[in-house]
Amino acid sequence: MALRVGLGLGQLEALFVLLLIGLLQSRIGADGTEASCGAVIQPRITGGGSAKPGQWPWQVSITYNGVHVCGGSLVSNQWVVSAAHCFPREHSKEEYEVKLGAHQLDSFSNDIVVHTVAQIISHSSYREEGSQGDIALIRLSSPVTFSRYIRPICLPAANASFPNGLHCTVTGWGHVAPSVSLQTPRPLQQLEVPLISRETCSCLYNINAVPEEPHTIQQDMLCAGYVKGGKDACQGDSGGPLSCPIDGLWYLAGIVSWGDACGAPNRPGVYTLTSTYASWIHHHVAELQPRVVPQTQESQPDGHLCNHHPVFNLAAAQKLSRPILFLPLSLTLGLFSLWLEH
């Protein structure tokens, strides 16, 4: 009689756990200093609402004098990417701190790490809300140790292209409606939004627009959201990530930048297109290596989303000398989802 040796159900479960631990150790160095970007342990949950702990481990909270003002994205063990408008020139870096590993901003957790800021590099072309160059690099005072709750997101290379219609996720701790703060304990919020082409976004922003105050969608901007409105970013999340999934990894496709009201119809959220600044990022931080983004799907034509005529004249708008005006976004954009479904 042949002797058959097999594993019981409990042994198989134990083996699976060991394999999972081994996989995580291969992605997180023994000293916690290395981790592959854009990988998460939590399964993806579509839609909107509160995220789960560790679901977006690159999301950080940027505080000014102890108050949350903006979001940001961890891209290495010592660098964070955020929006330039989060750091007015008159503010000192000593007044900022970066909170990593947080889920509920108002709750204490051993997973949370707070670092002071050693350096802030804002893009030189940034001038005001809605202008080009709304991106900043923040160097932490010391390297952070990666964990299940603290991990970097992938930076896209300069030639990266994210297709129209791709469903990405914007995250943050901002307002849930205009002038309505997220309630204690302020859990991290997530909202899935489809990407919209620059041409269609410009067309939408021309609907009911004030001619003297054009909303110009620049070449370094990316739009995402819903034509009917109701779900968007709002005050409190500027600088946070627009994370897009490509071939099993998450990429920092956009940085929450500006918008015209929160969740208004025909006004999708506008983000800084991170890939535009891949060379600028590498110039200032040589160790940051943007990744080539695989082209896994074609862009979906979205011209039908805007039937407004005439089509917004982008070239003419760029020639106007009058400043572009938006809502007062001094500490800008946070997740917004009106209760339209109720």
From Swiss-Prot:
Root EC class: hydrolase
Q: Which GO terms describe its cellular component?
A: external side of plasma membrane; extracellular space; membrane raft; plasma membrane
Query: Which region is the signal sequence?
Result: 1-29
Where does the record place the catalytic residues?
H85 (charge relay system), D134 (charge relay system), S238 (charge relay system)
* One of the protein's GO biological processes: positive regulation of sodium ion transport
Q: Give glycosylation sites per the record.
A: N159
Annotated Peptidase S1 domain residues: 45-286
Question: Does Nuclease show up as a keyword for this record?
Answer: no
| Keywords, sorted A to Z | Cell membrane, Disulfide bond, Glycoprotein, Hydrolase, Membrane, Protease, Secreted, Serine protease, Signal, Transmembrane, Transmembrane helix, Zymogen
Q: What SUPFAM superfamilies does the database record attribute to this sequence?
A: Trypsin-like serine proteases
Write the Enzyme Commission number(s) for this entry: 3.4.21.-
Segments passing through the bilayer: 320-340
Q: Does the keyword Ribosomal protein apply?
A: no
Localization, per the record, is: Cell membrane
Known role: Possesses a trypsin-like cleavage specificity with a preference for poly-basic substrates. Stimulates epithelial sodium channel (ENaC) activity through activating cleavage of the gamma subunits (SCNN1G).
The molecule here is called: Prostasin
